[in-house]
Regions:
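Conserved ATP-binding/catalytic segment of the ANL
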Residues: 1-47
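Flexible loop/turn segments at secondary-structure boundaries
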Residues: 2, 29, 36, 44, ...
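A generic "binding-loop/recognition-motif" signal
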Residues: 7, 41, 58, 77-79
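Adenylate-forming
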Residues: 15, 34-63, 92-112, 132-136, ...
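C-terminal boundary motif of the adenylate-forming
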Residues: 26, 31, 65-91
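Conserved C-terminal "lid"/linker of ANL adenylate-forming enzymes
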Residues: 70, 122-158
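Conserved loop-to-beta-strand segment in the C-terminal subdomain of adenylate-forming
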Residues: 76-101, 129-143
Length: 158
């Protein structure tokens, strides 16, 4: 690539002096030399302590829990990493029903101390695979899904 037409500034931002193209991707090489793209540089959070944290791996790990439907990790310019978590209300409803406390009210579910403890155990277990500074320290449970219509998601679901 030779650069942007009649735009030297944009060319210098995108291509270094050796001809390497800055894609904005973050990745790593494994032991066999394979490249894994793991995130986008613009998606990185920088904590108030200056630690760079990629939120996507944590968000993806959390939604693998049967009790977590959606998660958003926050922490840019903050002392620690937090998360907004939408529980899997179907799984939570079953969890409470199995305890003899059936409810289908999302607000009651997210305020229930046993549900909060259950999600805390899930988050703690999931966070063990991450560095100490990357781990979600606090979370808030949200009583509805993040949607485009509510303005919480973009059309590309970000």
């Amino acid at each position: 690539m030779t650069g942007y037409f009649n735009n030297d500034e944009a060319t210098h931002e995108a291509i270094d002096s050796d001809g390497w193209f800055y894609t904005g991707d973050i990745g790593h090489l494994d032991d066999e030399g394979y490249l894994f793209i793991t995130d986008r540089k613009k998606n990185i959070l920088v904590t108030s302590a200056g630690k760079n944290v990629a939120p996507a791996p944590m968000e993806n790990a959390m939604v693998n829990s049967p009790y977590i439907e959606q998660s958003v990790v926050i922490g840019d310019n903050r002392n620690f990493i937090s998360a907004l978590i939408v529980p899997s209300f179907e799984a939570i409803e079953k969890f409470l029903s199995d305890q003899g406390r059936p409810t289908s009210d999302n607000v009651l579910m997210i305020e229930d101390s046993d549900v909060i403890s259950l999600i805390q155990k899930e988050v703690d277990s999931i966070m063990e695979q991450f560095s100490h500074y990357e781990r979600v320290k606090e979370f808030a449970l949200i009583n509805r899904l993040f949607t485009i219509d509510n303005g919480e998601l973009t059309p590309t679901l970000k």
